[in-house]
Amino acid sequence: MASLIQVRDLLALRGRMKAAQISQTLNTPQPMINAMLQQLESMGKAVRIQEEPDGCLSGSCKSCPEGKACLREWWALR
């Protein structure tokens, strides 16, 4: 089980990462990593970066059958 400090240190070493990457690297369940990232965000230590859906060919992600799979969410230290 990873700690909040390990999540912070991993972000410091790698720059920015997806929550799934952090979960896999630290062998910690995704919901736990999501909670830790939200805690770091509320403490002002981490920031959520959402990419624009520029890869969407039709430009209509709301009606996309994959939902919002094209919207990537990254995390980085502030």
Curated annotation (Swiss-Prot):
<protein>
    <recommendedName>
        <fullName>Probable [Fe-S]-dependent transcriptional repressor</fullName>
    </recommendedName>
</protein>
<feature type="binding site">
    <location>
        <position position="61"/>
    </location>
    <ligand>
        <name>iron-sulfur cluster</name>
    </ligand>
</feature>
<feature type="binding site">
    <location>
        <position position="70"/>
    </location>
    <ligand>
        <name>iron-sulfur cluster</name>
    </ligand>
</feature>
<dbReference type="GO" id="GO:0051536">
    <property type="term" value="F:iron-sulfur cluster binding"/>
</dbReference>
<dbReference type="GO" id="GO:0005506">
    <property type="term" value="F:iron ion binding"/>
</dbReference>
<dbReference type="InterPro" id="IPR036390">
    <property type="entry name" value="WH_DNA-bd_sf"/>
</dbReference>
<keyword id="KW-0238">DNA-binding</keyword>
<dbReference type="GO" id="GO:0003677">
    <property type="term" value="F:DNA binding"/>
</dbReference>
<dbReference type="Pfam" id="PF09012">
    <property type="entry name" value="FeoC"/>
</dbReference>
<comment type="function">
    <text>May function as a transcriptional regulator that controls feoABC expression.</text>
</comment>
<keyword id="KW-0678">Repressor</keyword>
<feature type="binding site">
    <location>
        <position position="64"/>
    </location>
    <ligand>
        <name>iron-sulfur cluster</name>
    </ligand>
</feature>
<keyword id="KW-0479">Metal-binding</keyword>
<dbReference type="InterPro" id="IPR036388">
    <property type="entry name" value="WH-like_DNA-bd_sf"/>
</dbReference>
<keyword id="KW-0408">Iron</keyword>
<feature type="binding site">
    <location>
        <position position="56"/>
    </location>
    <ligand>
        <name>iron-sulfur cluster</name>
    </ligand>
</feature>
<dbReference type="InterPro" id="IPR015102">
    <property type="entry name" value="Tscrpt_reg_HTH_FeoC"/>
</dbReference>
<keyword id="KW-0805">Transcription regulation</keyword>
<keyword id="KW-0411">Iron-sulfur</keyword>
<comment type="similarity">
    <text>Belongs to the FeoC family.</text>
</comment>
<dbReference type="InterPro" id="IPR023732">
    <property type="entry name" value="FeoC"/>
</dbReference>
<keyword id="KW-0804">Transcription</keyword>
